[in-house]
Regions:
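Charged docking surfaces used in two-component/phosphorelay signaling
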Residues: 17-25
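Redox-cofactor binding/interface segments in oxidoreductases and associated redox assembly factors
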Residues: 53
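Acidic, metal-coordinating helix/loop segments flanking the phosphotransfer/catalytic sites
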Residues: 7, 32-50
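Non-catalytic signal-transmission and effector/linker regions of two-component phosphorelay proteins
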Residues: 1-7
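Conserved acidic carboxylate
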Residues: 10
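Conserved Rossmann-like nucleotide-cofactor binding loop
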Residues: 14
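A generic structural motif
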Residues: 26-30
């Protein structure tokens, strides 16, 4: 079974990188967005299981 798809929305690049590094260590699937507009596009096209803001 696949792990859930997580959308990480964070405008601060170092914080976003910290979150995604942690997710990679635990083999989670994730997408990133640096702003609300990109987050909406990613959410509508990929239908993530959870969104971290």
């Amino acid at each position: 079974m696949n792990k859930p798809l997580i959308l990480v929305v964070e405008d601060d690049a170092p914080v976003r990188n910290l979150i995604t590094t942690t997710l990679k260590l635990h083999d989670y699937r994730f997408l990133t967005a640096a702003n609300g507009e990109t987050a909406l596009m990613e959410a509508s096209s990929h239908n993530p299981d959870i969104i971290l803001l």
